[in-house]
Amino acid sequence: MALKEMVGTVVSDKMQKTVVVAVENRFPHPIYQKIISRTTRYKAHDAENHCKVGDRVRIKESPPISAHKRWTVTDVLVKGMKSKEAAK
């Protein structure tokens, strides 16, 4: 079975070597066909602490690293804005 890969946004980087990545899943409602958006948060391993809040990252499924970590950050696709830049 192939390992799953997902793309999401880093929403928290307050832990050491761990980031929380929010992945948005969009799908049509089975009856009404309205597009529904669901967000799932995954804890992912970031060995070098490269990721910051707002970064767009790709995560890949991995063997369990801790009680809640089952994903690893493979690469940073887009760097997020710094908080001072976002305020302008």
Swiss-Prot record:
GO terms for biological process: translation. GO terms for molecular function: rRNA binding; structural constituent of ribosome. InterPro entries: NA-bd_OB-fold, Ribosomal_uS17, Ribosomal_uS17_bact/chlr. Signal peptide: none annotated. Keywords: Ribonucleoprotein, Ribosomal protein, RNA-binding, rRNA-binding. It holds the Pfam family Ribosomal_S17. Part of the 30S ribosomal subunit. Belongs to the universal ribosomal protein uS17 family. This is Small ribosomal subunit protein uS17. It comes from Prochlorococcus marinus (strain NATL2A). The gene is rpsQ.
